[in-house]
Curated annotation (Swiss-Prot):
GO terms for cellular component: mitochondrial inner membrane
Molecular function terms, GO-annotated: metal ion binding; metalloendopeptidase activity
EC number annotated for this UniProt entry: 3.4.24.-
Role this protein plays: Has a dual role in the assembly of mitochondrial ATPase. Acts as a protease that removes N-terminal residues of mitochondrial ATPase CF(0) subunit 6 at the intermembrane space side. Also involved in the correct assembly of the membrane-embedded ATPase CF(0) particle, probably mediating association of subunit 6 with the subunit 9 ring.
Keyword Nucleus set for record: no
Localization annotation: Mitochondrion inner membrane
Gene Ontology biological-process entries: mitochondrial protein processing; mitochondrial proton-transporting ATP synthase complex assembly
Name by which UniProt lists this protein: Mitochondrial inner membrane protease ATP23
Length: 237
């Protein structure tokens, strides 16, 4: 009896099947797609499938991102305007410090004063999405040069920067909200989008306690930061 109990306590249960089948061949990919469509794959399995896809397509995703980045730097009125205004403040944003990379976290991009701008190539849906993302991060770069933003310790600074970037980049215009995020409201949709995205960004910062704290900080700076459209005369798009 003691032996049986000991043997049972040392045994391990088999890993739970999440529905994902490892493999990069076409047949396995099709099987995984079918499992996802028919509900035979858990959320964990879907995430594994997504990560495997991103790794598999990394080279192509980054090349497409770089080509679209270079096109936007040359031909996009919005991106060129922001680039010129950053240069007037003594900064320089170009293809040499805008990096296309595969990101592990579900985010579109990021700005670091010492590094530059990172675009998450595996999250870009199309060139329009990349333009919105690049504009968002370039507005952060502009704010860093003009207002000396304390990104690490001052949540009010971070909240204001996120409000301005979401407000001015074009990512909250109605068409983008409707087709990409399933937001159907007409009235006040722009303000609600800006507020929602600012709260999510502030909430992700280490100094923020929770969603309530993030909401409070965003509300404290909302009026002045939402009205501030520099370097534009008004909301561009």
């Amino acid at each position: 009896m003691a032996e049986a109990a000991s043997s049972g306590s040392n045994s391990t249960s088999p890993p739970k099947d999440n529905g994902y089948i490892p493999g990069d061949d076409a047949w396995t990919i099709c099987r995984n797609l079918w499992r996802g469509l028919t509900g035979k794959m858990t959320q964990e399995g879907m995430e594994q499938f997504r990560v495997a896809r991103d790794v598999r397509n990394e080279k192509e995703d980054c090349k497409r991102c770089e080509d679209q980045r270079d096109y936007l730097l040359q031909y996009s009125p919005l991106i060129r305007f922001l680039q010129d205004n950053i240069q007037q403040l003594g900064g320089n944003i170009s293809k040499h410090n805008i990096f296309c990379r595969r990101c592990k976290n579900r985010q579109a991009g990021g700005f670091d004063p010492d590094y530059g701008i990172q675009i998450c190539a595996n999250e870009m849906r199309n060139q329009g999405h990349l333009e919105d993302t690049l504009a968002h991060e370039m507005i952060h770069a502009y704010d860093h040069m003009r207002f000396k933003v304390d990104w690490d310790d001052n949540l009010r600074h971070a909240a204001c920067a996120e409000i301005r970037a979401s407000n001015l980049s074009g990512e909250c215009r109605w068409m983008r909200e409707f087709f990409s995020r399933g937001q159907w409201k007409f009235a006040q949709h722009h303000q609600e989008c800006v507020r929602r995205r600012a709260i999510l960004s502030v909430q992700a910062r280490p100094a923020c306690k929770d969603e309530q704290h993030a909401t409070q900080v965003v509300n404290e700076v909302w009026d002045s930061c939402f009205r501030d459209t520099r370097p534009f005369d008004e909301i561009y798009r």
